[in-house]
Design a protein with these regions (language model features):
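Glycine-biased, small-residue-rich flexible motifs in mid-sequence functional cores and linkers
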Residues: 2-250
């Protein structure tokens, strides 16, 4: 499908450049309407989570679904894939924001997952109908994908992420795996536009683990600190209140 419903975004965005002019999609576009928007939780994180991190992520995603939430992520390997798969395994609805065309799913390893998302009532969305012409443009699309994950969510959860410069191992694995894979971008934009920001963090086990360095940075952010996702905070992820900057499709 294709939509240009810019007039129906109910846009109150502080930076209107952030609003997509159109979206290409497969699946249920109503997952971006007003009522569903209140239930949309973005989940971001690194590409190479440990087994322990993966289990912690699965546990809270399952709880979000149990509470009636929808999951948004970027269809990348690692934490993104875990979020989408756990949602589907728990009979939830998930939205995948793509950095590529709908007919050129990236990464290729997730083509079957993308199809399963649509078959099970979810949604694939992208801003792109053509291929990038150069490496810089291709890299920029991953950053833009991260932006939309933030815009289409009511709240966002960072599973785990390194503190590293912005290079995309997701796209160029030869650059090294120890990157934030866009988590920093998504979390920053979420803060800028008033989304509730949460991180996984256990002081006794995660303090010296570099996989949680970005989590620690966000917790210590003096202007807009993130919160640790606890059992009680799970109920606040979907409190029925709409944030200020909302691109909604009705």
């Amino acid at each position: 499908g294709y939509t240009t419903k810019r007039d129906e975004y109910k846009t109150k965005m502080p930076n209107k450049k952030g609003a997509p002019h159109y979206l290409l999609y497969r699946g249920d576009i109503s997952l971006l309407n007003r009522e569903n928007f209140k239930k949309n939780v973005a989940v971001v994180g690194l590409l190479n989570p440990t087994a322990d991190i993966a289990e912690r992520e699965k546990a809270f995603v399952a709880e979000i679904i149990k509470r009636g939430g929808n999951i948004i992520s970027g269809l990348a390997l690692g934490c993104d894939s875990i979020a989408h798969k756990t949602c589907l395994e728990n009979n939830g609805k998930t939205i995948a924001v793509l950095p590529s065309r709908l007919d050129n799913i990236l990464p290729r390893e997730n083509i079957d997952l993308a199809n399963e998302i649509v078959v099970k009532g979810g949604l694939l969305v992208t801003e792109y109908y053509n291929e990038p012409v150069e490496r810089f443009e291709s890299s920029a699309r991953y950053i833009e994908r991260d932006r939309l994950q933030a815009y289409f969510s009511n709240s966002i959860v960072l599973v785990a992420s390194y503190r590293h410069p912005d290079k995309y191992s997701e796209q160029y694995p030869q650059d090294g795996i120890k990157r934030d894979s866009g988590s920093r971008h998504a979390m920053k934009i979420a803060g800028d536009i008033g989304r509730k920001r949460y991180v996984l963090f256990n002081k006794s086990t995660d303090s010296l683990n570099e996989m949680f360095d970005l989590n620690k940075d966000l917790l210590s952010d003096k202007k807009n600190p993130a919160k640790i996702l606890t059992g009680s905070e799970l109920d606040n992820l979907m409190d029925g209140k709409l944030p200020g900057a909302i691109p909604i499709f009705e």
